[in-house]
Amino acid sequence: MAKKHPQKPANLIAQNKKAGHDYNILETFEAGLVLTGTEIKSVRKGKISLRDGFARVRRGEAYLENVHISPYEQGNQFNHDPLRNRKLLLHKKEIAKIGALTKDKGITIVPLRVYLKHGFAKVLIGVGEGKREYDKRETLKRKEQDREMARALRKR
């Protein structure tokens, strides 16, 4: 089983709120990111978007794809491609486990959060299955009912 991760890391840079709405997250993993110099500078400034990102396992390695890291303003000719594929640093057993989980149809790997831990950029990835439209509506109804119950309990 994957390790338990803190709910809100101290140095949270970006969060993919849409992933929780669109996917049932089955398991989470913490992975390091291989970044160039201008990329880490942009990430530290918070210039990263996880919205359309996903991860893929290829030839025993995991890659983060379609995550946009804006070019660094002072990067001149050494700037990076904003949408390049970035390697994820995971243990071999974790990569094998993620690969086995994603063999099933409808299972996807999505980035949930990017944060700094001891000076290194980390990404929390979640393995999840896509929600159908009626599942999303059901989740919203349940959240609304919970809010109403909490409101009623506070008024007592």
From Swiss-Prot:
Concerning SUPFAM superfamilies, the annotation shows: Small protein B (SmpB)
Family statement: Belongs to the SmpB family.
Native source organism of the sequence? Latilactobacillus sakei subsp. sakei (strain 23K) (Lactobacillus sakei subsp. sakei)
Q: What is this protein called?
A: SsrA-binding protein
Q: Where is this region: Disordered?
A: 134-156
* Keyword terms: Cytoplasm, RNA-binding
Tell me the compartments it is located in: Cytoplasm
Quote one Gene Ontology molecular function term.
RNA binding
Q: Which domain of life is it from?
A: Bacteria
Q: Name one GO biological process term.
A: trans-translation
